[in-house]
Amino acid sequence: MATATTKTVKVRQTGSPIRRNAVQRATLAGLGLNKLGRESELEDTPSVRGMIRKVQHLLEIVE
């Protein structure tokens, strides 16, 4: 069987969730982020891209 390589995107949290609404805090948690400077490597899917777009002002794309 051939294994398919999945594309990934690596993001770093650069903004604080303090004083953000609950939806943005939940989106950060869904991306696996909760503290400044944390990094998370995620599958590059349309749903993850949408989550990144919702909180793009709090994130930095590393790769």
Swiss-Prot record:
It comes from the Bacteria. Keywords: Ribonucleoprotein, Ribosomal protein. Disulfide bonds: none annotated. Transmembrane segments: none annotated. GO terms for cellular component: large ribosomal subunit. The keyword Ribonucleoprotein applies. One of its GO terms (molecular function) is structural constituent of ribosome. GO terms for biological process: translation. InterPro entries: Ribo_uL30_ferredoxin-like_sf, Ribosomal_uL30_bac-type, Ribosomal_uL30_ferredoxin-like. The keyword Ribonucleoprotein applies. Part of the 50S ribosomal subunit. Belongs to the universal ribosomal protein uL30 family. This is Large ribosomal subunit protein uL30. The gene is rpmD.
